[in-house]
Curated annotation (Swiss-Prot):
DNA-dependent RNA polymerase catalyzes the transcription of DNA into RNA using the four ribonucleoside triphosphates as substrates. It comes from Synechococcus sp. (strain JA-3-3Ab). InterPro entries: DNA-dir_RNA_pol_insert, DNA-dir_RNA_pol_RpoA/D/Rpb3, DNA-dir_RpoA, RBP11-like, RNAP_asu_C, RNApol_insert_sf. It comes from the Bacteria. Pfam families: RNA_pol_A_bac, RNA_pol_A_CTD, RNA_pol_L. The N-terminal domain is essential for RNAP assembly and basal transcription, whereas the C-terminal domain is involved in interaction with transcriptional regulators and with upstream promoter elements. Its EC number is 2.7.7.6. SUPFAM superfamilies: C-terminal domain of RNA polymerase alpha subunit, Insert subdomain of RNA polymerase alpha subunit, RBP11-like subunits of RNA polymerase. This is DNA-directed RNA polymerase subunit alpha. GO terms for cellular component: cytoplasm; DNA-directed RNA polymerase complex. SMART domains: RPOLD (SM00662). One of its GO terms (molecular function) is DNA-directed RNA polymerase activity. GO terms for biological process: DNA-templated transcription. Residues 1-246 are annotated as: Alpha N-terminal domain (alpha-NTD). The gene is rpoA.
Amino acid sequence: MMQTSRTLHNLGSKAASSAAPYQTECVESHQEANGVHYGKFALGPLERGQGITVGNALRRVLLSNLEGTAVTAVRIAGVTHEFSTVPGVREDVMEILLNMKELVLRSNAPDTQVGRLVAQGPGEVTAEKLQLPSEVEVINPRHHIATLAEGAILEMEFMIGRGRGYRAVDYSDSKSMAIDFLQIDSVFMPVRKVNYTVEAARVGQSLEKDRLILEIWTNGSLTPQEALSQAARILVGLFSPLQEVSFDTPPEPRQAEDNQKNQIPIEELQLSVRAYNCLKRAQINTVADLLVYTEEDLLEIKNFGQKSAEEVVQALKNRLGLTLPRERSKT
């Protein structure tokens, strides 16, 4: 089945208010015999160099950031490990698990869903015989699962989850599910392949613009158009916070150093017992507390004499490079 579309879509966003909007054109769209959906898009005109920037960003997001649906674990009646066989079933358990892994599903349910299958031979079991929740749709209903002989029964239950990218079996997570569920590697990626090329675009008599050609292959759970739209929204959401970003100015190194010094307890000044006790009785516990005072103020502390004041001033200067004013400000 082959479709070619020439519809133009305006992709100028609110974020790009100062730049002229560019256009995207669906050059080709069709479904291949193996169920893969193909779409070819042209984006432009873009400023010189932006074709690679946009193409690379879209390709990365399309391949790794779009959510998809896949079978994550399977429980088969009478089976305790993946190296077993089911009586009357041509495929061994490993083959059945592989066939379940290749199911193409679509679901918007955020939580794990459970599907079931009860089939009796003889005959072929395909995906259309699966009992699925209303939120889940099978995209490849003719997909082969198993072949049953006369009188054979295949009964199984399977978990359906949503995710991104590829998720390998995590045996450390096996405690969260029943012991007879067999985990399988899950491929959530709805996009199977992305290619892009950049060519010169003519605007008037000039060829100083880029035209981005983007090819997208999906498994059918999303159309290439839907995948491109989702990828664009992800990128907009990723960059939009940077439009009004505000950075806290880090403190000047000297200021940070002074703040650190101010938090030093007066014990670090190694004062005489007399001077130390007088300061503590006056509720002076840190250097910050001490810097509030002048030399004149210190002399007003009970039992704090000129010698003790000079000792404090000298300790601050020698150990921390700090000084106290001699007198109160006249203002």
